[in-house]
Amino acid sequence: MEDIISHIRDKLKDSIIKVEEKATPRVYIEFKPENIPEAAEFVFKELGCRMITASGIDTPQGIEILYHFSQDVSGKVISLRTLITNKKSPEIDSIAHIIKGAEWIEREIWELLGVNFKGHPDLRHLLLIDDWPEGKHPLRKDNR
């Protein structure tokens, strides 16, 4: 795992907030939201990882987004983590132009948590009915 972390640190050292190894073979690397596209592109194109999925969670501090990647040759999992602190209007740059497979999961996070993925080619309902009330996001704690 150290070799992967050192490659990422060499390339992205100025934008890394925190590196956390919780359980082998997984590492969480935290970035500011504006650095996620560059980090995802590096992990995907340079390290040869595939995107597994992305996840989002409404926390007291903001909306946390994680992009999960697998480096299949080594069996390692790299999770790129970021926190969007503006819960009233959460937004982050989409990575769908870098990784086509991110399109649907970003749509799901947009729909369920209300995160606007800037530059996404097709933000429209995926799981909810088309006339779902605007501004109501089922996984947001303020909707309970």
Model-derived features with residue positions:
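Terminal low-complexity/charged segments
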Residues: 1-144
